[in-house]
């Protein structure tokens, strides 16, 4: 399965936060296939003076979607994230790792549970996801 993650940060050394998250994903998820360049954006859905740095990355993995969610939540915790966005209330964050979409045998996987929905239900509304996602898809399609 190929899993696409969206990673964002708007606190501290944002580029270092992205590197750390990528390193931890590399260790725990599987083979990294492609990563976008950094896309900078203003916060969406809340007020903050802190600009976001965002990337999208694709991995080949054998983990289940629910296991991947647990892995990403553990990485967020280890990196110091203390508040999760709940009910449409968003906060500044040192790291945010979202599962965006998954592909198996050239078909998109749809998944709905109490903890995870794929494809990500709001990714189409977010340039900070769609622009780097297109970059990653272009890289993968050129291989």
Regions found by a protein language model. Name each.
Residues 59:
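"…together with the soluble PPM/PP2C metallo-phosphatase catalytic core" -> "…together
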């Amino acid at each position: 399965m190929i899993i696409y993650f969206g990673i964002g940060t708007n606190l501290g050394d944002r580029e270092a936060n992205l590197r750390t998250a990528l390193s931890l994903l590399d260790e725990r998820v599987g083979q990294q296939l492609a990563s976008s360049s950094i896309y900078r954006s203003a916060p969406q859905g809340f007020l903050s003076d802190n600009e976001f740095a965002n990337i999208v990355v694709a991995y080949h993995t054998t983990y289940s979607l629910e296991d991947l969610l647990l892995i990403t939540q553990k990485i967020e915790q280890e990196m110091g994230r203390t508040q999760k966005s709940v009910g449409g209330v968003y906060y500044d964050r040192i790291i945010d790792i979202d599962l965006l979409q998954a592909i198996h045998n050239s078909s998109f996987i749809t998944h709905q549970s109490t903890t995870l929905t794929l494809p990500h239900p709001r990714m189409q509304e977010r340039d900070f996801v769609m622009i780097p996602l297109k970059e990653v898809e272009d890289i993968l399609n050129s291989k």
